[in-house]
Amino acid sequence: MGKGFPRCLLWNRNKVLDLSVLPERRQLEYYQNNPVVFLKQFLGTDLWAKQEEIATSLIDHKTVAVKSCHGSGKTFLAARLALWWLFTRPFSAVLTTAPSNRQVVELLWKEIRVAYANARVNLGGNLLPKAPKLQVADDWVCIGFSTDDPVNFQ
């Protein structure tokens, strides 16, 4: 991982959190429970009140539905929350989707690329130039896809 990578997100070679470094463990837990702070400190993102409410609702709820008009910042927020989840939950798989592949690539992943490129620190990982995929390690990844057939969504 690159220089400047947040110490709270560094992991040892055995893919296990180094529990001997308790302050970093506490810091990781802090960011897991504070997406608004993570977005501000690491991505430089300022949210408006409703976006903060949506972001914090992910802490306690498995499913969050957002009903809103066009242009309200849902895609902007979803992209940054995907990065928050990925980088605060090591060795996770973050799946992003939208109703069409065009929306995945041209909207959601465009926002992910912007947030990743403009992060205040080097987040690490390998953001593929054309594909909707950000790989941090072999089994630590964020990918985007869509399908017209619900059976394929597995």
What does each model-found stretch correspond to?
Residues 1-154:
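Phosphate/NTP-binding elements of NTP-utilizing enzymes
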